[in-house]
């Protein structure tokens, strides 16, 4: 028997939608006298469970190279909702005599991460080779993105897995539990100098407010999304055609959001919006995009990170509830001195 469950707030920062799930009948709950009943709060990161995630990374750090051959470090990014974004430092040793490294072992590393354990829930997996910078850490998110975006060959280094299983709470895909994944694999010498200033742009109707976010990264505001699920947006394809006329070689990553100011305000906002609101296969567009023997590439990526008509709504604070919690922290109340 199944009954509707939800909506409820989740750890990605949205109200998951109602779905039918099997009913479990509980007849007894046994406990010791004076039992401690653990609970936590979740919502848009960071929340209390953020500390659990940080501790898990610390506990498992030494195990990562043993479980995933060639992988030195992983970072399931809390600000992006954990499962939507996994950063990893891997190895590139397959052809050590080559003049310049290119991603080969890194692809094996990425498929290994997607093939077992909790890392298999990841949606975007971004990998860099330790050989290019022995001091590189994927816990330095801005530094890691800069390293990767300097080295990504966008005609070669994007590897999509389509129509596959997804985290149940991720509504960016084509249906419940189904969507796509992608590997960004970066190795070798830098391919470009990342731009650090905002260029002048001509934008089509509905797109506005271009914002420089970080070296090589640009954010635009787009019109409200109105397409059905599992469908390309003609407006995004038109945007790419127009942007292809501009000199954007220094911007390998362009993000279209509902609110460019909010998205570009901080790394936390950028990561949350970009990676929780996009499906790699459906929402990755590109300047000068092409498909050759089923491999897709471009000269600059454009990620559609707008809220879609089929997404779960974002969590919002309720003033009355916040007031009640604040009152618990007053002198003489249970949470005084704690929060």
Residue ranges of predicted features:
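Charged, compositionally biased interaction regions
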Residues: 1-339
């Amino acid at each position: 028997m199944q009954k509707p469950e939800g909506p409820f707030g989740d750890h990605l920062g949205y109200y998951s939608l109602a779905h039918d799930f099997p009913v479990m009948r509980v007849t007894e709950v046994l406990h010791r006298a004076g039992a401690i009943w653990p609970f936590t709060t979740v919502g848009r990161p960071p929340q209390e469970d953020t500390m659990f995630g940080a501790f898990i990374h610390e506990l498992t750090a030494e195990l990562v190279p043993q479980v995933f051959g060639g992988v030195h470090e992983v970072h399931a990014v809390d600000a992006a909702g954990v499962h939507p974004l996994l950063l990893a430092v891997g190895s590139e040793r397959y052809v050590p005599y080559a003049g310049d490294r290119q991603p080969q072992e890194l692809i094996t590393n990425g498929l290994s991460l997607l093939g077992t354990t909790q890392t298999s829930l990841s949606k975007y997996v971004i990998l860099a080779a330790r050989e290019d910078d022995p001091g590189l850490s994927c816990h330095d998110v801005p530094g890691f993105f800069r390293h990767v975006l300097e080295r990504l060959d966008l005609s070669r280094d994007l590897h999509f897995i389509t129509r596959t299983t997804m985290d149940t709470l991720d509504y960016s895909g084509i249906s419940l539990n189904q969507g796509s994944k992608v590997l960004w694999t970066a190795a070798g010498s830098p391919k470009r100098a990342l731009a650090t200033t905002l260029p002048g742009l001509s934008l089509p109707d509905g797109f506005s407010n271009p914002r420089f976010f970080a070296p090589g990264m640009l954010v635009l505001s787009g019109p409200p999304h109105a397409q059905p699920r599992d469908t390309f947006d003609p407006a995004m394809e038109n945007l790419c055609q127009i942007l292809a006329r501009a000199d954007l070689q220094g911007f390998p990553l362009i993000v279209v959001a509902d609110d460019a100011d909010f998205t570009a305000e901080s790394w936390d906002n950028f990561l949350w919006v970009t990676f929780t609101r996009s499906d790699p296969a459906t929402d990755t567009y590109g300047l000068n995009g092409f498909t050759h023997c089923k491999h897709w590439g471009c000269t600059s990526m454009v990620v559609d990170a707008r809220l879609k008509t089929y997404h779960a709504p974002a969590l919002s604070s309720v003033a009355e509830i916040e007031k009640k919690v604040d009152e618990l922290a007053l002198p003489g109340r249970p949470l005084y001195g704690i929060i």
